[in-house]
Amino acid sequence: MGWKSQNTLKGENNDMASKRKMVFGYRMEFGDIIPSPNEAETVQYIYATYLTGASFQHLAKELDKRDVPYDAGKRWNVNMVARILEDSRYIGTEVYPALISAEQLQAVQERRKQKRSIP
């Protein structure tokens, strides 16, 4: 991966990138972005559990209870869960390998849209 690609990735998601340096679920190995096994499993768990009806709050508490690491010294919160559930990179791009299916992402987006439209 060239200099330009690395800089583009670095600035792609500033709030997460500045703290994590890499999108949750991935790591850099020999210049390539590959799934980080434990984090990728957590991403898959978040999508699957949300699609069974769990709330952001429930997911954040469950991940904390299970001592799933996010960043050193940080506890999971609803914003972290929301960012993961909103991130389309998890279905795969030229740079990021797929961790979830496009159907899962679409189902999550539909559920979120329905929740927002309920009075």
Which residues does each predicted region cover?
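Conserved catalytic breakage-reunion loop centered on the nucleophilic residue
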Residues: 1-119
